[in-house]
Amino acid sequence: MDGSSENLPEVEEKGRESSCCSSETTRQEEEEQSPSCTEDFTASPVSSRWSVKNIDGEKKKIRSDSRVSEVEMMKERFSKLLLGEDMSGSGNGVCTALAISNAITNLCATLFGQLWRLEPLPTEKKEMWRREMEWLLCVSDHIVEMTPTWQTFPDGTKLEIMTCRPRSDLYVNLPALRKLDNMLLEILDSFEETEFWYVDQGIMAHESAADGSSSFRKSFQRQEDKWWLPVPRVSPGGLQENSRKQLQHKRDCTNQILKAAMAINSITLADMEIPESYLESLPRKGRSCLGDLIYRYISSDQFSPECLLDCLDLSSEHQAIEIANRVESSIYLWHKRTNSKPATNTKTSWEMVKELMVDADKLELMADRAESLLLSLKQRFPGLPQTALDMSKIQYNKDIGKSILESYSRVLESLAFNIVARIDDLLFVDDLTRHSSDQIPTTLGNNGNDAPKSIAVPVSNYTTPSYSPSKQELRSSITVPPSPSRFKIPHSSSVKRVLTAYVTKNEPRLKNLPLERSSRSSSSERLSLEKCMKESLNVSNLDPGI
């Protein structure tokens, strides 16, 4: 009995072991039959945790790489500014003011160029523009001026002390320029979902030949001068009325931005000192600057700037800027002679004695007339490039604050004008599409002379080859000045002969030159002068040989 009782627990243990083994084998078989479920159940949380960690690590790596690249880019920019664009380090570079001006100009040319299309600026370019402009403008935060203020002590006594505050011109104009900058970028961002698109001129010519729409190509002759610009296209029915109103509103806003940028730029240029090198390069006489014909008209009693401009050949931009340079140089030459005092110890020649006989009031009168002529010329051609004096001021300017304001306003002026020009192109195409059966003028927009104009800013030999952004004619939202081709008077020899004879007849001698400062002639004198010009035009139309 004892042996049998001892063997019973052993048998039970073996049975339990066999049952455990069988259960384990069945469990293993079940696991083998459904391996995917167990693998998914056990591996999914681990793999998800690893993927999240990898994504976070990649993001951190990208951020660190971008920060390193930004730091390296900032080091490169400021190294060029400190070296004055002279990479040899020998100290032959340009001054800091000109280096900052060149940097802002080149940055705008790199990111915006000619602004071929009305479309949002890519995010990378927008971030690069804001980041690098912030780097270049940060120096203005440390340009201050000392002003006296009164400080009150606890015992009631007052003491006058000098405190620092931002310089007045930067404090007023720089925030305004930043606001204009943001507004221009917002206007570009608004052209995201549009009813128009752009087609390259080669593709457009192929499509026109295929569908027979040669009239559209023929009417769009203005684009032939700028073959690189794509041509805007709209649907056959044209733009919707709401879209056209929004487009016109954007044009008006951009035009106001353009006027504000031009005003800041002109004020800044006027505040810059005239370089001595420019004054030394002027000739000794105003007649040498203006030429005999313009000088005789200015020194005459019958002087009218508008009539004088009508008889001059202003058919091209080159001729207009040449006359502007000559008139501007004569203005400063006469002012220089008025303010200068002749030396009494040196022996003068008879020619210098005759020049000294001319009264200072008469020289100022001539300078005032030349200024009125230059003003009329700029009003007739508001998009003229910078004159030789303006470029000389930019080149020899030492004031960093004025250099920042001038270059920043100039690039915003260029960007705003390009936006206005592209909107005018689009509005013209829309009008052409809506009224394809009517006779449409073959000039685009409100101004027929829309060729790009670059501002030639003098740079050093060490500057990276680049160009200033285009600066084209301003088109006012209220009144648009006509292009040279529209108001150009036929420059026959009879016009100049009659006008010269009329002026010569009434031309006074220098000693009889009036002392009054008025630069405008009476209405009767101007009417008589215009009458002579009209008669000469009628004669030239009847007989071209006269």
Swiss-Prot record:
GO terms for cellular component: cytosol; plasma membrane. InterPro entries: PRONE_dom (IPR005512), RopGEF (IPR038937). The keyword Magnesium does not apply. Coiled coil: none annotated. Residues 35-48, 463-480 have a biased composition (Polar residues). PROSITE patterns: PRONE. It comes from the Eukaryota. Induction: By auxin. Keywords: Cell membrane, Cytoplasm, Guanine-nucleotide releasing factor, Membrane. It holds the Pfam family PRONE. Residues 1-48, 463-491 are annotated as: Disordered. Residues 61-440 form the PRONE domain. One of its GO terms (molecular function) is guanyl-nucleotide exchange factor activity. GO terms for biological process: plant-type cell wall organization. It is found in: Cytoplasm; Cell membrane. The PRONE (plant-specific Rop nucleotide exchanger) domain is responsible for the GEF activity. Guanine-nucleotide exchange factor (GEF) that acts as an activator of Rop (Rho of plants) GTPases by promoting the exchange of GDP for GTP. In postembryonic roots, modulates root stem cell maintenance by regulating the expression of PLT1 and PLT2, which are key transcription factors that mediate the patterning of the root stem cell niche. May connect RopGEF-regulated Rac/Rop signaling and auxin-dependent PLT-regulated root pattern formation. Interacts with ARAC1/ROP3, PLT1 and PLT2. Plants silencing ROPGEF7 show defects in embryo patterning and maintenance of the quiescent center (QC), and postembryonic loss of root stem cell population. This is Rop guanine nucleotide exchange factor 7. The gene is ROPGEF7.
